[in-house]
From Swiss-Prot:
It comes from Homo sapiens (Human). Homodimer. Interacts with PTCD1. Zinc phosphodiesterase, which displays mitochondrial tRNA 3'-processing endonuclease activity. Involved in tRNA maturation, by removing a 3'-trailer from precursor tRNA. Associates with mitochondrial DNA complexes at the nucleoids to initiate RNA processing and ribosome assembly. GO terms for cellular component: cytosol; mitochondrial matrix; mitochondrial nucleoid; mitochondrion; nucleoplasm; nucleus. Transmembrane segments: none annotated. Residues 27-38, 208-224, 808-820 have a biased composition (Basic and acidic residues). Changing residue 622 to V: In HPC2; higher frequency in prostate cancer cases. GO terms for molecular function: 3'-tRNA processing endoribonuclease activity; metal ion binding; RNA binding; RNA endonuclease activity; tRNA-specific ribonuclease activity. Keywords: Disease variant, Endonuclease, Hydrolase, Metal-binding, Mitochondrion, Mitochondrion nucleoid, Nuclease, Nucleus, Phosphoprotein, Primary mitochondrial disease, Proto-oncogene, Transit peptide, tRNA processing, Zinc. This is Zinc phosphodiesterase ELAC protein 2. Residues 1-16 form a transit peptide.
Length: 826
């Protein structure tokens, strides 16, 4: 049996290696349309919105509390609907980790078009599309519509999901849970000026492209894909949108026991009209006696309101204080506001005008603050696994830290609570704070858990003895370059592995990034803590391998936070060198036009200009390439096309001291990469899938672990680090027999120097002990998969073996049918 399994794997490997030899990736098969989600079927059965009254349970929950590494995001739950307020980078990862179901989101509200609010939106929409959600309503500033169009630059047409955009000019939104009113607020600098472009709600699929007066473009200004508007937008940083959300009335609960005591026909068909009447507040007559509705029903809940408001800086304070819509909800008994959520920095909260505005809501209104004074840990699983890995090798797996704001939060005269990850405020059935879900990070518990695992301590001790007893290195290698793996997972951010990003510290004062997926800045914050500004100050360049969301959507955050870091360090802002496919510029151009100015942050080098023998497109690009080599002390920065999507590149960095680092990006085994990376010191190669999944690897244009190792061997690389693992291998990939003393496995926040190469293979036994349970589960899944393959192969062989060559197909099927049935019966 196992011999046949090995035969199947090797045959699959031969098929893959002998197949396509060109760099163009194979076309992907269209995925079948998913069945409607269960909650959507339930909603259809329930009938029109509001017909059964408001929901029984409603609460708000903090997803991200506003810290520098996570932004501010709020999740609202009812049994009918789910809502998300703001969707910055890392929000999807937090929702996945803390089991807040993304597939149930049917409304996303955005307070302004700032990257801290929308940085995770593209990835979230792609995930919603994959889950089969048919429609999502997005509300916020008018530029939101064009921002969503820009996603198609790298995602292609968003088929299968309708994105209905509601700008702030649209009427109020109403569903089964609540009515939402959008309140546009313009800063004092913006008041009195012409209102920006607006559009009514309509699906993006119906938007038609508009022609631009600047229709000509050169190599560095590529044409946008069909369906993406080329028109210059109206960037309006002076606009924020607040939301007033009013819960629907919830009818009282029918008191069954009380009804029985009164002799009502409980349990019969006659009780239905009685229940309907008393829930509507009507009295009934039973056996000549009038029964009031309040005798049979609990009091109805008229439905409180909550407010979500962002005040980015002091220029918005006066417009907020003077807003007439807010005034109608301040201190009014007929329009009680249970909670106001403030997304505001400390400089706003200490302003006396803003404090007076908060006080006008009255003493019964609670206030939740989300800003950088938050000290909450968000990514608990990442902290846990890093603490346990640190027991194996403290230098290679350093402990995580977090960015802490040095300013103390203000003291306020209103009931104010500082946000924490997973903090809840319940609106129904009763109003109260709920802190039981709040994350507590206890490293001691993580350590005890690891030490209690079978064979873990023994494996660590054996590794340390072997490290001490081993031969001393012939030469002590420099600390630099230092490789920091910030994201080692593929496709979407998950609780343990974030998406692609690798920091290469070339020297103490120079670094570059290899890819920059969503959440890269957050990973830097958790790795470096208060030193993150210093690290951003050393960043000289970013290489973006291709335009898939898990490789480039973290770039705007890096650009904006780098500007802040340089200012805090007292350094002038200068453009960051970005090596990428031309299409990246088109996406950044769209964001620049609609949301924030970012283009002055970058100097773009088209990745194709760094291919061997390529012509430099212009003298300006030639100067940028010279600057890149000089700044990073490189002899050469070369790219090559790899076998993934269109315009996908790998790269090779050759330092003046002689070392060579090669990065594959996403690719199937690629001869061009082998040639470019010849005699590399280090190859960082994607290994998305395990051995035995070669067919899936071809379909998804990725590599298996053994394929990645084979590329490194043919390249004659000194060492191979495997990277970009499918999220099905969240903790550790399956180790294959091809792992040797030249192969290591990357983890998020792993720090590797060239001198660590001999150590890396020795870490595998302790890693196997730490993740023994996960490895056992993966091996069981593999065995079941291989057993299915064996059965399919045997059945195919039996059917084929009973057929004689040259006979007509129908005759063969007729004559051999009894024999085939006999074989199956056996």
């Amino acid at each position: 049996m196992w011999a046949l399994c090995s035969l199947l794997r090797s045959a699959a490997g031969r098929t893959m290696s002998q197949g396509r030899t060109i760099s163009q990736a194979p076309a992907r098969r269209e995925r079948p349309r998913k069945d409607p989600l269960r909650h959507l079927r339930t909603r259809e059965k329930r009938g029109p919105s509001g017909c059964s009254g408001g929901p029984n349970t409603v609460y708000l929950q903090v997803v991200a509390a506003g810290s520098r590494d996570s932004g501010a995001a709020l999740y609202v739950f009812s049994e009918f609907n789910r809502y998300l307020f703001n969707c910055g980078e890392g929000v999807q990862r937090l929702m996945q980790e803390h089991k807040l179901k993304v597939a149930r989101l049917d409304n996303i509200f955005l307070t302004r078009m700032h990257w801290s609010n929308v940085g995770g939106l593209s990835g979230m929409i792609l995930t919603l599309k994959e889950t089969g959600l048919p429609k999502c309503v997005l509300s916020g500033p008018p530029q939101l519509e064009k921002y969503l169009e820009a996603i198609k630059i790298f995602s292609g047409p968003l088929k299968g999901i309708e994105l209905a955009v509601r700008p702030h000019s649209a009427p109020e939104y109403e569903d089964e849970t609540m009515t939402v009113y959008q309140i546009p607020i313009h800063s004092e600098q913006r008041r009195g000026k012409h209102q920006p472009w607006q559009s009514p709600e309509r699906p993006l699929s119906r938007l038609s492209p508009e022609r631009s007066s600047d229709s000509e473009s050169n190599e560095n200004e590529p044409h946008l894909p069909h369906g993406v508007s080329q028109r210059r937008g109206v960037r309006d940083s002076s606009l924020v949108v607040a939301f007033i959300c009013k819960l629907h009335l919830k009818r009282g609960n029918f008191l069954v026991l009380k009804a029985k005591e009164m002799g009502l026909p409980v349990g019969t068909a006659a009780i239905a009209p009685i229940i309907a009447a008393v829930k509507d507040g009507k009295s009934i007559t039973h056996e000549g006696r009038e029964i009031l509705a309040e005798e049979l029903c609990t009091p109805p809940d008229p439905g409180a309101a909550f407010v979500v408001v962002e005040c980015p800086d002091e220029s918005f304070i006066q417009p907020i204080c003077e807003n007439a819509t807010f005034q109608r909800y301040q201190g009014k008994a007929d329009a009680p506001v249970a909670l106001v959520v403030h997304m505001a920095p400390a400089s706003v909260l200490v302003d006396s005008r803003y404090q007076q505005w908060m006080e006008r809501f009255g003493p019964d209104t609670q206030h939740l603050v989300l800003n950088e004074n938050c000290a909450s840990v968000h990514n608990l699983r990442s902290h846990k696994i890093q603490t346990q890995l640190n027991l194996i090798h403290p230098d290679i797996f350093p402990l995580l830290t977090s960015f802490r704001c040095k300013k103390e939060g203000p003291t306020l005269s209103v009931p104010m609570v500082q946000g924490e990850c997973l903090l809840k405020y319940q609106l129904r059935p009763r109003r109260e704070w709920q802190r039981d879900a709040i994350i507590t990070c206890n490293p001691e518990e993580f350590i005890v858990e690891a030490l209690q695992l079978p064979n873990f301590q023994q494996s660590v001790q054996e590794y340390r003895r072997s490290a001490q007893d081993g031969p001393a290195p012939a030469e002590k290698r420099s600390q630099y370059p230092e490789i920091i793996f910030l994201g080692t997972g593929s496709a979407i951010p998950m609780k343990i592995r974030n998406v692609s990003a690798t920091l290469v510290n070339i020297s103490p004062d120079t670094s570059l990034l290899l890819d920059c997926g969503e959440g890269t800045f957050g990973q830097l914050c958790r790795h470096y803590g208060d030193q993150v500004d210093r690290v951003l100050g050393t960043l000289a360049a970013v290489f973006v391998s291709h335009l898939h969301a898990d490789h480039h959507t973290g770039l705007p955050s890096i650009l904006l936070q780098r500007e802040r870091a340089l200012a805090s360090l007292g350094k002038p802002l200068h453009p960051l060198l970005v090596v990428a496919p031309n299409q990246l510029k088109a996406w950044l151009q769209q964001y620049h036009n609609q949301c924030q100015e970012v283009l002055h942050h970058i100097s773009m080098i088209p990745a194709k200009c760094l291919q061997e023998g390529a012509e430099i497109s212009s003298p300006a690009v030639e100067r940028l390439i010279s600057s890149l080599l000089r700044t990073c002390d490189l002899e050469e920065f070369q790219t090559c096309l790899v076998r993934h999507c269109k315009h996908a590149f790998g790269c090779a960095l050759v330092h003046t001291s002689g070392w060579k680092v090669v990065y594959s990006g996403d690719t199937m085994p690629c001869e061009a990469l082998v040639r470019m990376g010849k005699d590399a010191t280090l190859l960082i190669h994607e290994a998305t899938l395990e051995d035995g999944l070669e067919e899936e690897a071809v379909e998804k244009t990725h590599s298996t672990t053994s394929q990645a190792i084979s590329v490194g061997m043919r390249m004659n690389a000194e060492f191979i680090m495997l990277n970009h693992f499918s999220q099905r291998y969240a903790k550790v990939p399956l180790f294959s027999p091809n792992f040797s003393e030249k192969v290591g496995v990357a983890f998020d926040h792993m720090k590797v120097c060239f001198g660590d190469f001999p150590t890396m293979p020795k870490l595998i036994p302790p890693l196997k002990a730490l993740f023994a349970g996960d490895i056992e589960e993966m091996e069981e899944r593999r065995e079941k998969r291989e057993l299915r393959q064996v059965r399919a192969a045997l059945l195919s062989r039996e059917l084929a073996g009973g057929l004689e060559d040259g006979e007509p197909q129908q005759k063969r099927a007729h004559t051999e049918e009894p024999q085939a049935k006999k074989v199956r019966a056996q």
